């Protein structure tokens, strides 16, 4: 077994790289634009490209990226989300219920799923962040959400480059 690394990523076919990038962020526009910046000299070049593309992504493409993220506390439908939200699964039922209630309030207020880099955070921490962010105005929240998506993408890209290959 070997680690994929940036060299291995660059050697993959365009289709394979596109598929992997889409697993990181479910915006086809983001994945295509990141891919267009390759081959990458090192992991930092990939991370920088991913961050720049996200910053320039139109809101419609950003909304498409959110479709790949389950609600915090809901059953994750992909391995990345499940791993990132692992500490929520063991939370007290009352905390999970409050998360569900505030998730719905967030979606009603802002029109999209509450997105936060959940990796390593407890359900209680995520609930406190959600409660705080419900007080944001829509423009501020959009910026915060975009920043959180960037953190998630970076975490997933790092994990992608570190995964073992056959």
Question: In which residue ranges do the predicted regions lie?
Answer:
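Conserved phosphate/anionic-ligand binding catalytic regions in large, soluble enzymes, centered on
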Residues: 118
């Amino acid at each position: 077994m070997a680690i994929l690394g940036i060299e291995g990523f660059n050697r993959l076919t365009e289709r394979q790289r596109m598929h992997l990038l889409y697993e990181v962020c479910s915006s086809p526009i983001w994945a295509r634009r990141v891919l267009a910046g390759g081959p990458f000299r090192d992991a930092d070049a990939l991370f920088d490209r991913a961050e720049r593309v996200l910053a320039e992504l139109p809101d419609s493409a950003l909304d498409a990226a959110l479709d790949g993220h389950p609600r915090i506390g809901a059953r994750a439908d992909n391995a990345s989300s499940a791993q990132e939200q692992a500490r929520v699964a063991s939370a007290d039922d009352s905390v999970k219920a409050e998360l569900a209630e505030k998730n719905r309030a967030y979606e009603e207020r802002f029109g999209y799923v509450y997105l936060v880099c959940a990796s390593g955070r407890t359900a209680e921490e995520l609930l406190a962040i959600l409660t705080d962010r419900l007080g944001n105005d829509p423009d501020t929240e959009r910026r915060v959400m975009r920043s959180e998506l960037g953190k998630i993408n970076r975490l997933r890209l790092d994990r992608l480059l570190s995964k073992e290959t056959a």
